[in-house]
Curated annotation (Swiss-Prot):
Family annotation (PANTHER family): PHOSPHATIDYLSERINE DECARBOXYLASE, PHOSPHATIDYLSERINE DECARBOXYLASE PROENZYME, MITOCHONDRIAL
Species this chain originates from: Pseudomonas putida (strain ATCC 700007 / DSM 6899 / JCM 31910 / BCRC 17059 / LMG 24140 / F1)
EC number: 4.1.1.65
Cofactor note: Binds 1 pyruvoyl group covalently per subunit.
Name of the featured protein: Phosphatidylserine decarboxylase proenzyme
Sorted UniProt keywords: Cell membrane, Decarboxylase, Lipid biosynthesis, Lipid metabolism, Lyase, Membrane, Phospholipid biosynthesis, Phospholipid metabolism, Pyruvate, Zymogen
Cell compartments where the protein resides: Cell membrane
Function: Catalyzes the formation of phosphatidylethanolamine (PtdEtn) from phosphatidylserine (PtdSer).
Protein family membership: Belongs to the phosphatidylserine decarboxylase family. PSD-B subfamily. Prokaryotic type I sub-subfamily.
GO cellular component: plasma membrane
Residues found modified as Pyruvic acid (Ser): S252
Keyword rRNA-binding attributed: no
InterPro entries recorded: PS_Dcarbxylase, PSD-B, PSD_type1_pro
Amino acid sequence: MKSRLFIISQYLLPHHLLSRLAGCIAECRVRWFKNAFTAWFAKRYQVNMSEALVEDLSAYEHFNAFFTRALKPGARPLDETPGAILCPADGAVSQLGPIEHGRIFQAKGHGFSAQELLGGDPAMAAPFMGGEFATIYLSPKDYHRVHMPLAGTLREMVYVPGRLFSVNQTTAENVPELFARNERVVCLFDTERGPMAVVLVGAMIVASIETVWAGLVTPPKRELKTFRYDEASRTPIHLEKGAELGRFKLGSTAIVLFGPEQVKWAESLGAGSAVRMGQQLAAPVQA
């Protein structure tokens, strides 16, 4: 009954208004308030501050600075296995596996369209048909920066407007097409394993999504917008494996897509597996 009421509330709540309010609170610089709120959050979610570059909670100018905190050098060593595809973020594997008939598995009884996830462009989605996906959920306690699984050159970025349903096991099992309905930023790269998409999916009270090349991705109008980076007039944007790609200001989910016969997921990983940025997520399929 509680789960049913929670799902009903997800459809009734003003998602974007709540997220804007959360954003205002997260950017508040009133010292006593931001210190108290940050301390409560760190204790409530058992955030490990010993690995943070700045351990003193009161040193952060606002909650968002704490939430997107940098880690100490070496806190997330990169797997050195030749050809290893790295996990892009801390969190847990929600699902991973093949993209079958153009659809990505969400939870028992639910899936969603890979084409819709990527913004609806059939040409962008085509290279991923029959490929592989991994969905990584970032919990409140996690490090909320997203990094490159492989070195790549940015081809395009797509802002896709949408709802801001909460992202958790209950919504994954009860909200159809959850990740293809929420607001998201699609980043398409050319890599040694062919096209790679990294999709940053928003959720309720996710105040914003940033990328290292564009900053806050907040178009003036909430409408689909594509940014091309492969035009001759632009300086190429190349990011090395393990480099920061973007970050969530109050986070959610990162989804990685590869084409067919390119990667093989680590056998030790499955739905619910805890992961850390930099560990091996997959190995390359040998040609």
